[in-house]
């Protein structure tokens, strides 16, 4: 596996004043949507909230991207969808952000690294990695080149 920039605990990270923003992307349109949510819960619980600002970004079975800020347990049950706010990944490599849409207004939400926790199609085939590479957003996992192997 080729690993992109990964945020790991180090003295350099601890000395930084602001927290790095880590986005966990889960769900998706594949038949493994529920498995992805279960994996995301484990990842969200494992991330150190004192070191990182954690964003939960879920993709519904219909393909809608939502940012969710509620209890992690709702990710596993699927209740997160009721409380999510529409969000998109900006393809603009100079921004490195999500775009949150509220009341017709667009707010940029900067992100330092993405942890894609998508299973099946669009998650394990290199699609999400390719999207992140186009936006030049660092991510954890295999490089998009894996989509060329089959």
Could you tell me what each predicted segment is?
Residues 2-3, 11-150:
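ATP-binding N-terminal substructure of ATP-dependent carboxylate-amine bond-forming enzymes
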């Amino acid at each position: 596996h080729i690993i992109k920039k990964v945020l790991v605990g180090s003295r350099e990270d601890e000395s930084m004043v602001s927290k790095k923003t880590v986005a966990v992307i889960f769900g998706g349109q594949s038949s493994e949507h529920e498995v992805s949510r279960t994996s995301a819960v484990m990842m969200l619980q494992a991330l150190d909230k004192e070191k990182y600002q954690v964003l939960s970004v879920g993709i519904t079975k219909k393909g809608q991207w939502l940012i969710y800020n509620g209890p992690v347990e709702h990710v596993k049950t699927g209740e997160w969808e009721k409380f999510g706010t529409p969000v998109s990944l900006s393809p603009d490599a100079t921004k490195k952000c999500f775009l949150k849409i509220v009341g017709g207004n667009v707010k940029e939400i900067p992100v330092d690294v993405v942890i894609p926790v998508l299973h099946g199609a669009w998650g394990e085939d290199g699609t999400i990695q390719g999207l992140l590479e186009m936006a030049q957003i660092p991510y954890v996992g295999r490089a998009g080149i894996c989509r060329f192997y089959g």
